[in-house]
């Protein structure tokens, strides 16, 4: 089943709060503290300077984001120069200041697994991502996102044990730098809400939470199997969610995203007391990237206004 069929089917279907401290203050007004950010994949579809005729230069990203109406931007490790240096980081910080945008979340992953069963590989991954925590701090981010449990190579409970160790260590390090660590549902075990809940409850660090992705629910490959209801998945994770990836691809003539019911999703997210960022992630190709980003942002703003 492809993503569109899966989400259309799931849309017909449709919490115990762990010891997580607030990024937001509890409020009777839904989404009072929510900030809408843009994720770089919306505008840049290749990494490390790869060929992307419709893309932009990563250092122009803050100004372009501002021109599209954003005050907050996410960063992606693969969009920075492959040989990153202090000058590059300083240039990005300066360009953010010039554009009057703030950094929200640094997205990392794909260069090692902090929950690897092999201790040498796990330690190497942790060292790599601690380096990126330092960069997130220099960029002025509130949080860094990482992935864990994406690839199924060992049994469910065994993977959880190593994931707890890795997330605790990286979370402790992020906390020492004043950052939150967010683990995303990014396929594999991480797309099983119960596995993620077990991970959060066992890690139990004040600065560790979840980045909830609207569409990443692939449990296994060949054949593809999915967590059956993305809305229920977000609902189960909502006590731990501090940011979401608001995915979009195609829109109806009335401006509704055609694969995700945004109003239903944000109704559920009213139960997420720590939600601070909604990151616009447009991946479509039938309209311009700028238009897709603007439609997604407008849709989020519309449903939030309706829910208030």
List the model feature ranges, each with a label:
Residues 101, 179, 272-276:
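A short helix->loop->beta-strand "cap" motif at the edges of active sites that frequently abuts
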Residues 240-242, 274-278:
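A short pocket-lining beta-strand/turn micro-motif at the edge of beta-sheets
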Residues 2-138, 157-158, 165, 175, ...:
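N-terminal pre-domain/capping segments
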Residues 246-254, 277-287:
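Active-site clefts of carbohydrate-active enzymes
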Residues 136-156, 177-186:
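Active-site groove signature of glycoside hydrolases
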Residues 42-44, 77-79, 109-112, 148-152, ...:
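Active-site-proximal loop/turn and secondary-structure-junction residues that shape catalytic pockets
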Residues 72-73, 168-268:
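Acidic/histidine-rich catalytic cores of soluble enzymes
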């Amino acid at each position: 089943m492809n993503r569109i069929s899966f989400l259309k089917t799931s849309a017909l279907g449709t919490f115990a709060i762990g010891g997580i401290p607030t990024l937001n203050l509890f409020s009777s007004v839904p989404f009072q503290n929510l900030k809408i950010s843009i994720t770089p994949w919306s505008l840049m579809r290749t990494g490390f300077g790869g060929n992307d005729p419709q893309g932009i230069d990563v250092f122009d990203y803050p100004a372009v984001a501002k021109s599209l109406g954003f005050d907050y931007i996410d960063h992606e490790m693969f969009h920075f120069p492959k040989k990153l240096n202090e000058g590059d980081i300083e240039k990005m910080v300066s360009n953010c200041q010039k554009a009057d945008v703030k950094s929200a979340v640094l997205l990392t992953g794909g260069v090692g697994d902090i929950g690897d069963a092999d201790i040498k590989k796990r330690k190497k991954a942790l060292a790599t991502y601690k380096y990126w925590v330092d960069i997130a701090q220099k960029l002025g981010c509130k949080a860094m996102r990482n992935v864990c449990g994406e690839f199924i190579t060992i049994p469910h409970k065994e993977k959880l044990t190593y994931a707890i160790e890795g997330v605790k260590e990286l979370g402790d390090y992020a906390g020492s730098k004043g950052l939150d660590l967010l683990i995303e549902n990014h396929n594999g075990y991480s797309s099983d809400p119960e596995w993620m809940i077990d991970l959060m409850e066992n890690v139990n660090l004040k600065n560790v939470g979840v980045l909830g992705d609207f569409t990443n629910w692939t449990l296994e490959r060949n054949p593809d199997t999915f967590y059956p209801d993305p809305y229920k998945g977000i609902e189960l994770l909502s006590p731990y969610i501090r940011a979401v990836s608001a995915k979009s691809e195609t829109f109806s003539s009335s401006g509704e995203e055609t694969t995700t019911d945004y109003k239903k999703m944000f109704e559920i997210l009213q139960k997420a007391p720590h939600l601070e960022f909604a990151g616009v992630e447009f991946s479509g190709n039938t309209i311009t990237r700028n238009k897709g980003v603007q439609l997604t942002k407008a849709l989020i703003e519309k449903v939030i206004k309706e829910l208030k």
